[in-house]
């Protein structure tokens, strides 16, 4: 039984980073404690009053209902129009990475182009999220994101960067100052972020994010 359990461990666990090949790096980036695959939750559309009070009349605007939606074409057409206006497709899954030095090494081995990260920060990166509709919202994204640790004050990002990708997608980089130390005693850290009307909140198992018994954050 012990032999079978050991055989199931991915090859990258038994090698140093320098010994990794491209396949090891890809396996690490597919499934490891630093990598989370999540389906964003979609937030409801804002009412006109909520948009006005927030100072952004375009935020969280749903589809219009047209003439049918106000009942001019009959009750059946009205119900259909309202259903279409409120229907929201399930968001596609995204990847959230805790961009430690180990993760960046894996990205290089795998031939990926990763965003530049200042070592003075913890970096959490959300990949392939729908591109925000406005390009002046980095400050807004910073105000609706944090790292949550049990019994401690939430850690807010110092900076947020929005990087345009392909096919209407974006990479969003969240930078948290390392002057607030995260330790093994924190056990689990929840990353919470809202991007437009989408919301992600994966948990990271800090105890598992170790290499040779040293935290790799």
Residue ranges and their predicted role:
Residues 8-217:
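PEST-like low-complexity, intrinsically disordered acidic/proline/serine-rich tracts
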Residues 2-7:
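Boundary at the C-terminal end of the N-terminal hydrophobic targeting segment
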